[in-house]
Amino acid sequence: MPSIKSDIEIARAAAKKPIFEIGAQLGIPVEQLAPYGHDKAKVSAEFIAAQAGRKDGKLILVTAINPTPAGEGKTTTTVGLGDGLNRIGKKAIICIREASLGPCFGVKGGAAGGGYAQVVPMEDINLHFTGDFHAITSAHNLLAAMIDNHIYWGNEENIDIRRIAWRRVMDMNDRALRSMVSSLGGVANGFPRQGGFDITVASEVMAILCLATDLKDLERRLGDIIIGYRFDKTPVHARDLKADGAMAVLLKDAMQPNLVQTLENNPAFVHGGPFANIAHGCNSVTATKTALKLGDYVVTEAGFGADLGAEKFFDIKCRKAGLRPDAAVIVATVRALKMNGGVKKEDLGTEDVAALKKGCANLGRHVANVRRFGVPVVVAINHFVSDTDAEIAAVKEFVSRLGAEAILCQHWAKGSAGIEELAHKVVELAESGQAKFHPLYGDDLSLFEKIEIIASKIYHAGEVTADKAVRDQLQSWEEQGYGKLPVCMAKTQYSFSTDPNLRGAPEGHIVSVREVRLSAGAGFVVAITGEIMTMPGLPKSPSAERIFLNDQGYIEGLF
């Protein structure tokens, strides 16, 4: 029996086309592409602006059930479906997020898909790529430096150093940096204060880049960032420190979407990368809108399960950008359904139809939740070699009772040939006119009511708790004019609840909001629940331990 090739071996053997040829497939002239080597390029702002009058294609969201720690192949399915749509004669473009170094060297691995459904160059995409994350990190930390510098040189804005909300960021999992005291070492180093680091993908600058429509909108949003409060409790904005212009300069090139290709030489935009458990979890509005102008179908993903990524895609990205999705694909795996049914991770390779049927309650809730937004749904069963016929049949039967269809997909092993049936079904749904998209809640509700609606309708929580300080802060923001903003929930991805160990479809649990943060530039309020951290830590045995350069200088271990 031949050995199974690793993702990196498959990617390295890809017959890539020069990036200018991929651009030509979309009608992008050579002079409107800024190449980064031979296989990736940025699309110019000038070209993007010139497409404004063109009709939009169909927008397809790929989301998932609550995942196992290894992920369920949502990006793989997004890439596979894009290839599948092109295979059946549709002009399809894929839009996914860039990879963060944190999970790449931590536990989850890369973000370029897997098997024979990948975007390439895989190694570049998973590491430094075109430098967007570096630019975002630099812009964020420039503002942090200017805050402390302003205070050092006299504090003209009367910033209360006890109420500075702007932390620093880096693109790495490093729990040691969550809480720290800066400016130690004497008068020459400034005024000591407590602070800390978040991971870059949790940065408001990342969210702003992904929600901004052009450079002018980007600079306006950067200026709207609230870095902290004065002694009279009025907010201090980034523009008060004259930081917004320099930040926009650092982000000028990063605003341009990155064009790459799949293993089957189909176009893909890989741009932006906010996490879905601690941020809004979607690729950039610029990339999505550009793709909609250039393709008949755009396949995009939202991070983690539909309770996080899809809800934020609908309630934040679509609401803010005026997007109207035409269909949604929910990715499910037999192993994740069994885990939601109580099977331990080490036993997931053993057939257990009873546990799987129990775990299907998780899938059923995600189907119902997506339908709440008026979007038609199909379920993609991402096939693993350990799946049995009985288990697959049980999933299909369960989904059919919901009035939907579950389709077995083998794109990981077979590429576009393994996902044709799903591609045809997606076209059927998107062309049916069934989609009647609407957000979950209205703008005029109070911020706490919005949190309660998400918790009750999507998570099926029985109660939302928050101490007086949290409620008072929300009320204060409403009085300052921020009450119409949507809410971005920061929650574990492993459960509908705030307890990562509470699998399946729990009812009546309590959602405890322990902290709220105002992202005035991005245009949402973050509600942090449970034990979720905006700076993750590495696991006991991180992926980094297995990544190295071989004798030929090639990377090994990067999935």
Swiss-Prot record:
Q: Which Pfam families match?
A: FTHFS
Q: Please give a single GO biological process term from the UniProt record.
A: tetrahydrofolate interconversion
User: Domain of life of the organism in this record?
Assistant: Bacteria
Instruction: Please give the catalytic activity noted in the UniProt record.
Output: (6S)-5,6,7,8-tetrahydrofolate + formate + ATP = (6R)-10-formyltetrahydrofolate + ADP + phosphate
Q: Does the keyword Transcription regulation apply?
A: no
Q: Which residues bind ATP?
A: T68, P69, A70, G71, E72, G73, K74, T75
EC number in record? 6.3.4.3
Top EC group: ligase
Give any GO molecular function from the UniProt entry. ATP binding
Sorted alphabetically, the keyword list is: ATP-binding, Ligase, Nucleotide-binding, One-carbon metabolism
Pathway(s) where this gene product acts: One-carbon metabolism; tetrahydrofolate interconversion
The keyword Cytoplasm is annotated on this UniProt entry: no
What family does this chain come from, according to its entry? Belongs to the formate--tetrahydrofolate ligase family.
What protein name is recorded for this chain? Answer: Formate--tetrahydrofolate ligase
Q: Which organism is it from?
A: Rhizobium etli (strain CIAT 652)
